[in-house]
């Protein structure tokens, strides 16, 4: 890739139909983990006009009122009137949940957490870069900020005409591999009938864009596409069917890193799609925080029923202060990559997952997000002797 280029990432709001589905799946997971930390959960959700379907495989001693939980998530997200695409109080809720296959369970459940086997085969990636304060790529970082601001203004009532469904997209111009300015901002937001397109355009620029995007990244040539198709009244599940796991690039690094293909929401941490990806982020972030590299991608891969990974790879894209092979050896020494130890060390059996389902699983330094800690940075730096 040339050192001068444009790079784009997107984010979506919590009212986007796919994110509504993610929230429902993770809310169910959380409620189960509150009662049963040993539960096996793989929960998928589909939302469409007037209905929500929950399906999957769950083995647990917990009892959860699935229907009530689904309704609460939908209304809390802002869908409390049929005119918005779905009303959580009156929509149909269909439950098609079964139990985890015995064939899978026999390979995963080994008694002690230390011996826990991976819930499936798969490959996962973690990534970090020193472009932003949270060590996330710039385009996804600013896209998430735009969507969080949209939600804040909607919930506070400051822009009362906003509705839950929205998307943002940011294009960064890079020079010598460093982000220099924003070339294009795209933001589409659902709204009610009371607002004109000019009023909406001006309010989005003044109250959303200018409040979260640093002035130094905006130039006279920065292009804005605000609700570029015009009216956006029909949104949410009425506009598009929503499914769990369809926003995996929004959930991770906005396309700036590889993705193993596995979604996160609705899965307990024995599923390495989730826990392995969280560990990958933890490793990559600590490597960059330690100053071992400006940019780092980590790949891990697992076999179903096997505790240890089958492979580990580190790529610093030529920015490493020591070789990638040397960093790999340090990672193997400092981090325990057995599935059970990942769960234990990152404390992943807590009911924290609904918080992850919006605005990215990475880059928000919340107390619950243990994979965002940089507590191994000093250890890595000392071991690398840099």
From Swiss-Prot:
Flexible loop: region residues: 100-110
GO molecular function: ATP binding; magnesium ion binding; methionine adenosyltransferase activity
Residues binding ATP, per UniProt: 16, 165-167, 240, 246-247, 263, 267
Pfam families noted in UniProt: S-AdoMet_synt_C, S-AdoMet_synt_M, S-AdoMet_synt_N
InterPro entries (UniProt xref): ADOMET_SYNTHASE_CS, S-AdoMet_synt_C, S-AdoMet_synt_central, S-AdoMet_synt_N, S-AdoMet_synthetase, S-AdoMet_synthetase_sfam
Documented EC number(s): 2.5.1.6
Keyword annotations from UniProtKB, A to Z: ATP-binding, Cytoplasm, Magnesium, Metal-binding, Nucleotide-binding, One-carbon metabolism, Potassium, Transferase
GO aspect biological process, one term: S-adenosylmethionine biosynthetic process
Residues binding Mg(2+): 18
Compartment(s) where it occurs, according to its Swiss-Prot or TrEMBL record: Cytoplasm
Record-listed K(+) binding positions: 44
Pathway: Amino-acid biosynthesis; S-adenosyl-L-methionine biosynthesis; S-adenosyl-L-methionine from L-methionine: step 1/1
Main location: cytoplasm
Enzyme class: transferase
Top-level division of the source organism's lineage: Bacteria
Reaction it catalyzes: L-methionine + ATP + H2O = S-adenosyl-L-methionine + phosphate + diphosphate
Quaternary organization: Homotetramer; dimer of dimers.
Descriptive protein name: S-adenosylmethionine synthase
Gene: metK
């Amino acid at each position: 890739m040339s050192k001068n280029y444009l790079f784009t990432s997107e984010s979506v709001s919590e009212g986007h139909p796919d994110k509504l589905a993610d929230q429902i799946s993770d809310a169910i997971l959380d409620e189960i983990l509150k009662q049963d930390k040993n539960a096996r959960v793989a929960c998928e959700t589909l939302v469409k006009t007037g209905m929500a379907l929950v399906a999957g495989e769950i083995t647990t001693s917990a009892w959860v009122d699935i229907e009530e939980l689904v309704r609460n998530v939908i209304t809390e997200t802002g869908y409390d009137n049929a005119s918005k695409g779905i009303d959580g109080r009156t929509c149909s809720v269909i439950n098609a949940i079964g139990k985890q296959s015995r064939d899978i369970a026999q390979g995963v459940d080994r008694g002690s957490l230390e011996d826990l086997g991976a819930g499936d085969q798969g490959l996962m990636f973690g990534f970090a870069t020193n472009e932003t304060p949270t060590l996330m790529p710039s385009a996804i970082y600013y896209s998430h900020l735009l969507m969080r601001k949209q939600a804040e203004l909607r919930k506070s009532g400051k822009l009362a005409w906003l509705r839950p469904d929205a998307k943002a997209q940011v294009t960064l111009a890079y020079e010598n591999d460093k982000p220099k300015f924003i070339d294009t901002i795209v933001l589409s937001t659902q709204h009610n009938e009371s607002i004109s397109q000019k009023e909406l355009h001006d309010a989005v620029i003044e109250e959303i864009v200018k409040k979260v995007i640093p002035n130094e990244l905006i130039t006279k040539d920065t292009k804005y596409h605000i609700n570029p198709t015009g009216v956006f009244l029909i949104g949410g599940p009425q506009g598009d069917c929503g499914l769990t796991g369809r926003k995996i690039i929004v959930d991770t690094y906005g396309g700036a890193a590889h993705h193993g293909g596995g979604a996160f929401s609705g899965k307990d941490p024995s599923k390495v799609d989730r826990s392995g990806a969280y560990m990958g982020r933890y490793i990559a972030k600590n490597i960059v925080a330690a100053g071992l590299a400006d940019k780092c991608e980590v790949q891990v891969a697992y076999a179903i029923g096997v505790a240890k990974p089958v492979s580990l790879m580190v790529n610093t894209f030529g920015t490493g202060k020591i070789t990638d092979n040397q960093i790999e050896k340090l990672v193997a020494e400092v981090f325990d990559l057995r599935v059970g130890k990942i769960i234990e060390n990152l404390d992943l059996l807590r009911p924290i997952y609904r918080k992850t389902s919006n605005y990215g699983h990475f880059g928000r330094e919340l107390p619950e997000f243990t994979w965002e800690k940089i507590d191994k940075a000093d250890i890595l730096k000392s071991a690398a002797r840099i």
